[in-house]
């Protein structure tokens, strides 16, 4: 028991939802399981010209394009914080270290934007003073996932994912929205990989790789 407690103390503050090293590797992408975007689109009618400014390998873009949305997207090759073009809608899983700056920029160039962030992002005095009390471009809705989604894994086409230890939510900011923010839930339970299912999928993946080996 003492050993387990010591292990927990060592891991305290690390991002459980990405990997168990606590460090973000240069090759880490923190990709968004397809189902997280699909569930949002079941609740929100996204319109107008769309931008995804932190697309990584294109997980969010793939879902939107599959549904017929036309959009612009980029990643590190362009600095979103210097963007001047106006877009009606922005949807992204922003780099957490730049989330505050991304929010400020999105308010300058869009009418509505959707950011995937940890639920704990609601906490903080600076955010309260500069983000949550903004009446001209307020937070309108928060969509909280009922199960903790694990980000950063290799994505599955069926949208299923493992569970992590970080609560995530879609935050929706809407220009000129009136009223208090509304909290809603997105039930992602059907997309959670069950233990046996994950084991079988792992075996299938190994077999596929072995079949592709040139022996």
What are these regions (language model features)?
Residues 1-215:
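Class I S-adenosyl-L-methionine-dependent methyltransferase catalytic core
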């Amino acid at each position: 028991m003492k050993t387990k407690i010591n292990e927990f103390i060592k891991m305290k503050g690390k991002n459980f939802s990405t990997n168990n090293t606590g460090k973000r590797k240069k090759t880490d992408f923190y990709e968004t399981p397809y189902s997280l975007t699909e569930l949002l689109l079941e609740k929100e009618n996204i319109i107008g010209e769309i931008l995804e400014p932190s697309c990584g390998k294109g997980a969010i873009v793939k879902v939107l394009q599959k549904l017929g949305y036309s959009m612009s997207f980029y990643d590190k090759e362009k600095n979103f914080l210097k963007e001047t073009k106006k877009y009606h809608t922005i949807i992204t899983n922003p780099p957490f270290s730049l989330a505050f700056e991304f929010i400020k920029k999105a308010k300058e160039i869009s009418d509505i934007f959707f950011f995937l962030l940890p639920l704990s992002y609601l906490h903080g005095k600076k955010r309260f003073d500069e983000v949550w009390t903004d009446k001209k471009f307020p937070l309108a809705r928060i969509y909280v996932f009922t199960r903790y989604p694990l980000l950063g894994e290799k994505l599955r086409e069926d949208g299923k994912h493992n569970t992590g230890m970080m609560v995530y939510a879609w935050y929706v900011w809407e220009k000129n929205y009136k009223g208090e923010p509304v909290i809603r839930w997105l039930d992602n339970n059907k997309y959670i990989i069950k233990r046996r299912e994950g084991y079988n999928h792992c075996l299938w993946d190994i077999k596929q790789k072995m079949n592709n080996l040139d022996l």
